[in-house]
Amino acid sequence: KFHGEPFNFGPSNFSNKTVLNLVKEISSDFANFKWKILKRKKTFKETGILRLNSSKAKKYLKWQTKLSFKETMRLTSEWYRSFFNEGKKIKTFEQIENYLKKYIYR
């Protein structure tokens, strides 16, 4: 029925976060992560919140978010730290296996 069609998987509409929330959370996982907000003259219109539309996955796959924002950011930080600092030993399969054990195969 959905051969080759893409699906978006994202947070529920009730847990959307701003880019600032994301940067603050990610920076808390990295010791030397420095950032600052630059005020620039806007030459284009930008929406306040960017979000994925996961309605298709929710409707047809009965998919729902399992991870909190904080946990998602922790796993993302862990993956990037592993990728850049541990000899390119990517944690993808380990993270998927842990997710399945915790949320699917309980």
Locations of the language-model features?
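C-terminal substrate-binding subdomain of Rossmann-fold SDR/epimerase-dehydratase oxidoreductases
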Residues: 1-106
